[in-house]
Structures are given as C-alpha cells and as structure tokens.
Amino acid sequence: MIRISVDVMGGDYGPEVTIAGAAIAQKHLPKVHFLFYGIDEAVEPVLKKYPDLLSVSHFYATESYTRMDEKPSQALRVGRGKSSMWHAIEAVKNGEADSCVSAGNTGALMAMSYFCLKMIAETERPGIAGIWPTLRNDSIVLDIGATIGASANQLVDFAVMGASMFRSLYNVEKTTIGLLNVGVEEVKGLDEIKKAGIILSKVQFEGLEYKGFIEGNDIGKGMVDVVVTEGFSGNIALKVAEGTAQQISELLKSAMRSSIFSRFGYLLSQSAFRKLKQKIDLDRVNGGVLLGLNGIVVKSHGSASASDFSSAIRIGYEMVNNELLKKIITDLQCFHEKKAIFLNNKGESVIDKETI
C-alpha cells in the first residue's frame, strides 16, 4: 500500500478538484490509500459524492487552511500545526504517509516542507523538478521556482537529484544532463554555472552523463534528459513554454474557424491535432517534485483541473513506488565522495582557474 496525504484545501478550486482528482487517480493506482486534510464543512459534502474513495481514504479535519495569496512567512507562522497543508506534510514526517500532494501556495509549501521535513544532509537548498514534454521524450527541468540564484555546488546537487528522479520515472540506467546557459561555449555564462560544468565534467559518476551547456531553445528539442538551472531562469522558461503552448492552441483554433475549407480540413485531421495537443500539453505531466527534502512532496498547479491533479498524485505514487528518496540519498552520498576525492587531488584552484 502506498499512502498519499492530500492538502484538500489547496489550489484555486479546493475540494471540488482535489477530491475529484483523487477519485480519478484511484482508478489507475491499485495500491493507493489517501489521507485527506481539510476543513470539515468544505470537505465532507464533496467526499460523499465519491463513495468509491471511502474504502481507500481517511479524512482528518483541520483548524485552518493556507490561502493562495498568503505570504510564506505568515502561512508558516499562522498555519504551523493547524493548516491542512502543514498536516499533510507532517504526515510524511511522522511516517503516516509516503508522499504529500498539494496544489496550494508554492512559497508556503516550500517553507512548510523545509521546516517540517528538513533537508537531506548532503544538500544545501531544495529545488522543484518539473516534467517537460519535448520533441523526443519527456525531460526533467529543475529548478523551476524554488530558489532564486544558485551556487555551483547547488547546481551540481540539482543535477544529481534530477538524474535520480529521471531514472526512477523512466527506468533507464544512464541519464544525460545539460546546464542551461546563454550559450554552449565553455567561456560563456556566470562563473557559478561554469564551475558547476567543470565539476560535472570532471567527476565521473555512474548513471550520469554530462553533455555540457544547452540554450533555452534546446529544452523543447529534448537534447538532454535533465536540464539544470536556478529557479529564476527555470520559472521564466516554464511560463514561456506554457504561454507558447496556449498561443499555438489558440492560433490553430482561429485558423480552423477562418473558412469552410479550413473547417473541413480540421475534420479530416482531427486525430493528428489531438495528438499534437496531447504532446504539447504541460498539464498532462502536472506536478513538480520538491527535491532535497527528507520526504516526497509534489506541487500541483494551483489552477489544475481534476484530471491535472490526478497526474500530480500519480507522480507522487510513482516516486514512492520506485524508491526515489532512497536513490537520491545514495546518489548524493556517492557523488559527494567522488567530488571530495577530486577536489583533494586537484584542489579548488583548478576549478577557479578554468572559469577565468
């Protein structure tokens, strides 16, 4: 049995979407059991609409919930020990749940997860890893919004954790890594990015193949399995991709309605357009995983539909089923040992000289 705690009050639509999403996920996840956390009068009426959930869930009433516009510091101060978000995260800490899923306030979720679960010993800062549809297969991009700015060591940790997640999701032995930069040449970019590139290229680690720098237009091509960046750039890239996908969809709809001939052409090509929509739909892989914590927390889009939220639940389920946390801890320990040996032999000065 895989136990998933759900912040039922999270997101723009609350229980109407989160519980409906759980009902969809339950049909496809045979071993799932839900722990629902939320306000009694808001949750109970919705939960009664889904009798099939009653045998695979337990509802825990909470005093409060975290608003979408609440500042992280305020949400933590007011909601600690009281809110549905805090209790859902705390269930993972206490071993009552295997993963947590929330569509709530991103900043609050990051703050509560950080203070409740704490960081894995080998990491400095958490990152949000998102699944990204590409021309080849899905890629993982991190960080897409957890941190603003990152040191070379933090970028390297993101690379290792992203590789662990990719192998967990797609059952591959080796993962290719690229650092997002303003150019592919080694002399370009910020010093921290160049230092991270040197470490990843020099420290040999089984299961991780560093491919060098990639540019923003390479993400959608699927040039690498894992794209590593800091949260500011990663979040902008994500929002641009979402906006572009929406723009393409609207332009196609407009073109199809422009004349009777285009409408007829659309009818003949419906299956092809349906496949295109599925391919570029980021909601299909809705759910960013907070990596670097002593527990698995999945962040769904606040505006997610029930189907989208079920995708986030599926990701949380798969991460537990494939023992992501154990793989991350093992991989980080192993990589840090190899990195320490390299630095002891070569010294930090080697990295500094190569970035000049």
Curated annotation (Swiss-Prot):
Entry superkingdom: Bacteria
Protein's cellular compartments: Cytoplasm
Pfam family, one: FA_synthesis
Reactions it catalyzes: a fatty acyl-[ACP] + phosphate = an acyl phosphate + holo-[ACP]
Ranges in a coiled coil: none
Family to which this protein belongs: Belongs to the PlsX family.
Subunit structure and binding partners: Homodimer. Probably interacts with PlsY.
Known role: Catalyzes the reversible formation of acyl-phosphate (acyl-PO(4)) from acyl-[acyl-carrier-protein] (acyl-ACP). This enzyme utilizes acyl-ACP as fatty acyl donor, but not acyl-CoA.
Protein name: Phosphate acyltransferase
Source organism (scientific name): Bartonella bacilliformis (strain ATCC 35685 / KC583 / Herrer 020/F12,63)
